[in-house]
Amino acid sequence: MNNQDQSLIFEVSKEGRVGYSLPELDVPETDVTDVIDEAYIRDEPADLPEVSELDIMRHYTALSRRNHGVDSGFYPLGSCTMKYNPKINEKIARIPGFSAIHPLQDEATVQGALELLYDLSEHLEEITGMDEVTLQPAAGAHGEWTGLMMIRAFHEANGDHKRTKVIVPDSAHGTNPASATVAGFETVTVKSNDDGLVDLEDLKRVVDEETAALMLTNPNTLGLFEENILEMAEIVHSAGGKLYYDGANLNAVLSKARPGDMGFDVVHLNLHKTFTGPHGGGGPGSGPVGVKKELIPYLPKPVLVKKDGRYTFDHDRPHSIGRVKPYYGNFGINVRAYTYIRSMGPDGLKEVTENAVLNANYMMRKLAPYYDLPFDRHSKHEFVLSGRRQKKLGVRTLDIAKRLLDFGFHPPTIYFPLNVEECIMIEPTETESKETLDAFIDTMIQIAKEAEETPEVVQEAPHTTVVKRMDETKAARKPVLRYEK
């Protein structure tokens, strides 16, 4: 095995090798069957790797060097808001009063933690223009489902059982139609117009007495602000439907505009994105949901309330959709988000949006001469390019993404949204310096020139990574998901 190989930890195993040696037993030996029912005892030993501590350290350290995160490099993944997560968040989250408590403790012993949750809810209400917020949902899609279930409960409580359809734009996140389906709705697609915005005439066509809600991201997934949002709200509300805000792109409007003022009835947020809870690797996340007054009765229970200066959970909510998560949400991520909001303040959050939008537009204008710009207008926090020009030269958007790896950059989101051919979606966030943006811009320009002059360099990329291109078809059809001898 050379130093560039990366064996599985099972393949490093040597029979009889141990990581730790225990002292000689100095207490009476106990038969495991005396303390554990035989039904729960394995018939044979688990096939675990036998390795030393040094083997473990080198194995996982080597793997970590191959990983890419916000702390190691630029991560312009569109619609993901991969901003830097301030380390003060981690320090606060590790305070014993936050990290060493248990959700089953008596409320009287965790008043400080409950106060934080209550204050966080109030801050999020102010930021979004909602009347009340629940912190239970564990992530964005979970928040979507929670919000839709409240909308469903509202319609059913009003005897409006025919509202079975949720409208989503053709540029929507894939989680929107998925969440609607899981919540028991049928999805209806509304088209975008030539400007990349929701087509109002098509919206009027699809809205009817069966419409439960319209789900929107604003700005949308193309990075464009839905400038007709007030008219859209009127169209949906006049038909008896509700307007749902997907908070994936809230980073573009912090302290500048509020979903509640745009006419939205329900909002979900991604604290692990906009409010710097670390994300990636599957979690944990936090997807709070805010609602307007008439939907408050349907919030998940229990609801945190303040009575006589004390914080307590109110379980007496007869119209609630019930719990959506055990206990009270992902507390550690909520602590980090609260720390971020209090650290930044209203003016700081406004500056976040201003810099995020400035960075995106700066990059867009610098790259427009080299890549197709489907929507040549002011963008918000992210923007979309198209690799159509390069595709004519035999270089696909996938090739461009692979080539970026050679320069130490994580690729942007590609081939999404689906309504843009050879889509390249870039979100720089506010935390990146001009020097970093310029380095990425220069690299993208170099790749565009390579596509014209030496396309094979891009087509065969990456060249410097340990793992080159995988057989993606084989990986999809014959995945190897577990180790076998």
Curated annotation (Swiss-Prot):
GO MF terms listed in the record are:
glycine binding; glycine dehydrogenase (decarboxylating) activity; pyridoxal phosphate binding
Q: What is its EC number?
A: 1.4.4.2
Kindly list the biological process annotations in GO that this record carries.
Answer: glycine decarboxylation via glycine cleavage system
InterPro entries per the record? GcvPB, GDC-P_C, GDC-P_N, GDC_P, PyrdxlP-dep_Trfase, PyrdxlP-dep_Trfase_major, PyrdxlP-dep_Trfase_small
Instruction: Indicate the enzyme's highest-level EC class.
Output: oxidoreductase
Q: Which residues carry this modification: N6-(pyridoxal phosphate)lysine?
A: 273
Needed cofactors, names only, are: pyridoxal 5'-phosphate
Self-association state and partner proteins as the record states: The glycine cleavage system is composed of four proteins: P, T, L and H. In this organism, the P 'protein' is a heterodimer of two subunits.
Q: What is the recorded function of this protein according to its Swiss-Prot or TrEMBL entry?
A: The glycine cleavage system catalyzes the degradation of glycine. The P protein binds the alpha-amino group of glycine through its pyridoxal phosphate cofactor; CO(2) is released and the remaining methylamine moiety is then transferred to the lipoamide cofactor of the H protein.
- Name of protein: Probable glycine dehydrogenase (decarboxylating) subunit 2
Its encoding gene is what?
gcvPB
